[in-house]
């Protein structure tokens, strides 16, 4: 029975963070489109560096911390509301705020196919990592597993964006994703033990790219 529950949890986690799950993440690049336009990301090597830096030290790291905290406090509505408010405040640009809130809303809407009381404990609108953290926690999925798959989903989407932007091909894109495995597992392990005191980023160029994307005339992505 324990094995069945673990398999069920794995299936749910895979479904929720699959590219096929209807959250619309394909529409966002998180500033990567601007970075490509500005010549900051030009090939597979620089794409891998960009993604790895954001996971370890940028906005994606903050998302991982928020996910872990929401996972930890999924049974406490007051704490979830506080974490959700903090997640909104940490959005560094209008597009970044729009992205995390719309993804969170779409995730919660789709995840209601698996009924649980956590949906009543969360705010009506919650940032994406807060939504994912609370729902995975409520369904008994371990924080490190949830974080690893969440980070891998981000990396996979970023690689897909890089391919669509023409900085790498599919074969090199797969190699980028494979090369990020060690980074993802290390950050997932670190984030699982994190607290809100560990929030913080040091990716100024990425933050500026996110802001500059708001005035970009020609674009494929919404962020």
Curated annotation (Swiss-Prot):
What GO MF annotations does this protein's record show? nickel cation binding
Keyword Cell wall biogenesis/degradation applies: no
Question: Which one Pfam family would you cite for this protein?
Answer: UreF
Q: What is its main location?
A: cytoplasm
* Subunit structure, as described in the record: UreD, UreF and UreG form a complex that acts as a GTP-hydrolysis-dependent molecular chaperone, activating the urease apoprotein by helping to assemble the nickel containing metallocenter of UreC. The UreE protein probably delivers the nickel.
Say what the protein does.
Required for maturation of urease via the functional incorporation of the urease nickel metallocenter.
Report the superkingdom from the record: Bacteria
This chain's protein is named: Urease accessory protein UreF
Question: What InterPro entries does the annotation carry?
Answer: UreF (IPR002639), UreF_sf (IPR038277)
By sequence similarity, the record places it as follows:
Belongs to the UreF family.
Q: Does the keyword Cytoplasm apply?
A: yes
The alphabetized UniProt keywords are: Chaperone, Cytoplasm, Nickel insertion
State the compartments where it is located: Cytoplasm
Q: Give the encoding gene's name.
A: ureF
**What does the entry list under GO cellular component?**
cytoplasm
């Amino acid at each position: 029975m324990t094995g069945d529950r673990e398999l069920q949890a794995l299936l749910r986690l895979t479904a929720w963070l699959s590219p096929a799950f209807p959250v619309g993440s394909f529409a966002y690049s998180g500033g990567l489109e601007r970075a490509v336009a500005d010549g900051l990301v030009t090939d597979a090597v620089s794409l891998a560096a960009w993604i790895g830096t954001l996971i370890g030290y940028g906005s994606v790291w903050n998302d991982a911390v928020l996910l872990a905290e929401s996972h930890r406090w999924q049974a406490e509505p007051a704490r979830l509301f506080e974490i959700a408010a903090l997640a909104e405040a940490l959005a560094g640009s209008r597009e970044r705020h729009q992205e995390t809130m719309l993804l969170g809303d779409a995730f919660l809407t789709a995840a209601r196919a698996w009924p649980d009381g956590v949906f009543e404990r969360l705010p009506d609108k919650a940032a994406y990592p807060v939504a994912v953290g609370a729902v995975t926690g409520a369904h008994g999925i371990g924080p490190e597993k949830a974080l690893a798959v969440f980070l891998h989903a981000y990396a996979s989407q970023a690689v897909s964006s890089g391919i669509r932007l023409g900085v790498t091909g599919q074969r090199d894109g797969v190699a980028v994703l494979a090369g990020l495995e060690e980074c993802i597992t290390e950050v997932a392990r670190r984030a699982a033990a994190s607290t809100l005191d560990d929030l913080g980023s040091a990716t100024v160029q990425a933050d500026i790219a996110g802001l500059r994307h708001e005035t970009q005339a020609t674009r494929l992505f919404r962020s």
